[in-house]
Amino acid sequence: MRVEGIQRNWKQWWIWGILGFWMVMIYNVRGNLWVTVYYGVPVWKEAKTTLFCASDAKAYDAEVHNVWATHACVPTDPNPQEMVLENVTENFNMWENDMVEQMHQDIISLWDQSLKPCVKLTPLCVTLHCSNRTIDYNNRTDNMGGEIKNCSFNMTTEVRDKREKVHALFYRLDIVPLKNESSNTSGDYRLINCNTSAITQACPKVSFDPIPIHYCAPAGYAILKCNNKTFNGTGPCNNVSTIQCTHGTKPVVSTQLLLNGSLAEEEIIIRSKNLTDNVKTIIVHLNESVEINCTRPNNNTRKSIRIGPGQAFYATGEIIGDIRQAHCNISRTAWNKTLQEVGKKLAEHFPNKAIKFAKHSGGDLEITTHSFNCRGEFFYCNTSSLFNSTYTPNSTENITGTENSIITIPCRIKQIINMWQGVGRAMYAPPIEGILTCRSNITGLLLTRDGGTGMHDTEIFRPEGGDMRDNWRSELYKYKVVEIKPLGIAPTKAKRRVVEREKRAVGIGAVFLGFLGAAGSTMGAASITLTVQVRQLLSGIVQQQSNLLRAIEAQQHMLQLTVWGIKQLQTRVLAIERYLRDQQLLGIWGCSGKLICTTAVPWNSSWSNRSQEDIWNNMTWMQWDREISNYTNTIYRLLEDSQNQQEKNEQDLLALDKWQNLWTWFGITNWLWYIKIFIKIVGGLIGLRIIFAVLSIVNRVRQGYSPLSFQTLTPNPRGPDRLGGIEEEGGEQDRDRSIRLVSGFLALAWDDLRSLCLFSYHRLRDLILIAARAVELLGRSSLRGIQRGWEILKYLGGLVQYWSLELKKSAISLFDTIAIAVAEGTDRIIEVIQGIWRAICNIPRRIRQGFEAALQ
């Protein structure tokens, strides 16, 4: 009894030991994490890249921005898409935005391009004999106070050795006296730029009215947009969307006042890099526009003056009517209300202090006045009357004036413009004929704050300007460019099967706007959108190439490829290079054409000790990328080393005879091949059986078919030399044997005719009977054939059913046999192991019995 109990206990311990061993193995297998590569994850990083532009410019427009946009920009998308990124917070900084620098360089190149084919006015650096413009006719007034000078000078004609005296009108701001004389007197003058910079005359048919320009990111990059209505330009933004192109930005060149821009959606926004630093410019974004109407009332005429062969200088010829000063009109009520709101917002940043607005403290004319372009004429308007008020917090007084009154600010006009792009460059703007009127909207202010410690209870703000980057920054403050990083790495429990020959799927490739649509989702939720994101990346590249080809085709008639065309090519090449670089990495890692690629690289807990559930259920791809960014290069190197080792192992394995490794016989690939060969053999046997059955049926049909015999004997008529029947013959004699003996020509002819008719009748009757018999036999044969065909089909159906049952029985028998063999083999193995174990367990007892026997 004790022996049986010991055996039973050992058997239980053996079973529990096996179960525990397999549980430990399963736990170890499940506990390991492996590096998995994902292609198309919503991850990005801040980047600087070449942007291209889109515009609605027309090729036939002569306006300078349109000319530039036609040559450089692709058509705008009629249905722009914007994808909101849920649960995403992104940092923006309008003061360190590369988009602003790019737009600045683009506008500089725009102006340079517009002046490149125009006339250089170096020959105009001559002595000008000028006097104040006088009134030649009655009933005309001149309130300009010597603002316009009537100058005469000698100029070279078409023939270089001949000169002639010409007259032209110049603004006083464009000329300086040669001697220390008052500019109000008559005397000798020169153009203001002759001792400082070269001057180029703007082409006469070109104006400077801007059109909206959209900046677009190339494929592989995206533009993030902050949609917070009170965003001040810096810091985090929790309402982010991704777009392909910005809104249309008008490149308006102006100082002090921002014109024709976008408006704040809710309240006035104050933006500055550092409000406590009085050197930094303050950009005020208005929520309501203030209309400003500017007019040059003088009805000017323009005349052309020859300054050399093939060169013409355009100057003001005459002023028709009164000579009046240019000016701008602003509604006093609207302006005072706006300034009141601006003062209120500034007081929030400077509490317990009065906010005072004052005129500019001094400097160049371009920054001390509100300078802008009006239909080709450059205005410089004095804004002292606009910025001359004080806002006191908690005061009942408002900055208001007479209701419905108008603020009129005087303006001066210059034709020689110091280019804002750089020092030492100037441009001559030809006079525009007729009366000029411009209507614009003030959408922002450029201010600066006085420093020092003079007034502790008052902050003085003055209009500022001059750096056109602030103009572009006021429109591009809510955008930033990011680079898409479609390659993601994360730990999973799936491991790559190694040292196997596999057919890799052909790659499908990789805008664009839906690409980052899952950015705020968890990693597990975002991974299901990889296919869509990868396809949109490739479609973005293709779409950009298509747009580029259309843009080049539009300018093909002029055979021009300016710097803008080069930028387009750069963006195209950049997008393709990024795509190829990602595909190269996937190829090096053995992941070509795969969106999710398992690897044989184990995950190191030093990279991240988070659990798999925590990573995939609680983190976004952006958060995960930031966490492992320091180890990305290390993981990339390990992936490359693993793939190299994998390829080396495959090469070594393929070098051996595959039949030497019997284990490969039981691989799933070989079993599929065995099944395919078996199906082919069975199909061949069934086909042979069908062929022999058909041949047998045909043979039987042929044996049972007896056609009408054409050898049936018919009674032949006896000849005239044949004897009659014997005497014993009885019965009626045949008609052939009746021979009529006729004589005479008519009788013979009649007999022959009768014989011919009878012969024809009998032959025709026989032919009809044969045809009827043939038709009858053919019908019977056809019916018999249809019946036999139906029998053949039934036979084939039965044959197929029989063989299917046989195959089913064979398969069931095969599986039963395998199951029985496996069960019996398992039982035998268990019995052998139990026997060995019992033998081992009985060794002490046998030794004891041996000692007992020896001692006895």
Curated annotation (Swiss-Prot):
Residues 454-464, 456-464 are annotated as: V5. Highly glycosylated by host. The high number of glycan on the protein is reffered to as 'glycan shield' because it contributes to hide protein sequence from adaptive immune system. Palmitoylation of the transmembrane protein and of Env polyprotein (prior to its proteolytic cleavage) is essential for their association with host cell membrane lipid rafts. Palmitoylation is therefore required for envelope trafficking to classical lipid rafts, but not for viral replication. One of its GO terms (biological process) is virion attachment to host cell. GO terms for molecular function: structural molecule activity. Residues 151-194 are annotated as: V2. GO terms for cellular component: host cell endosome membrane; host cell plasma membrane; membrane; viral envelope; virion membrane. Residues 381-411 are annotated as: V4. Residues 505-525 are annotated as: Fusion peptide. Residues 294-327 are annotated as: V3. This is Envelope glycoprotein gp160. Inhibitors targeting HIV-1 viral envelope proteins are used as antiretroviral drugs. Attachment of virions to the cell surface via non-specific interactions and CD4 binding can be blocked by inhibitors that include cyanovirin-N, cyclotriazadisulfonamide analogs, PRO 2000, TNX 355 and PRO 542. In addition, BMS 806 can block CD4-induced conformational changes. Env interactions with the coreceptor molecules can be targeted by CCR5 antagonists including SCH-D, maraviroc (UK 427857) and aplaviroc (GW 873140), and the CXCR4 antagonist AMD 070. Residues 32-677 are extracellular. Residues 699-856 are cytoplasmic. Pfam families: GP120 (PF00516), GP41 (PF00517). Keywords: AIDS, Apoptosis, Clathrin-mediated endocytosis of virus by host, Cleavage on pair of basic residues, Coiled coil, Disulfide bond, Fusion of virus membrane with host endosomal membrane, Fusion of virus membrane with host membrane, Glycoprotein, Host cell membrane, Host endosome, Host membrane, Host-virus interaction, Lipoprotein, Membrane, Palmitate, Signal, Transmembrane, Transmembrane helix, Viral attachment to host cell, Viral envelope protein, Viral immunoevasion, Viral penetration into host cytoplasm, Virion, Virus endocytosis by host, Virus entry into host cell. Residues 567-585 are annotated as: Immunosuppression. InterPro entries: Gp120_core_sf (IPR036377), Gp160 (IPR037527), GP41-like (IPR000328), HIV1_Gp120 (IPR000777). The chain crosses the membrane at residues 678-698. A lipid is attached at residue 757 (S-palmitoyl cysteine). Residues 360-370 are annotated as: CD4-binding loop.
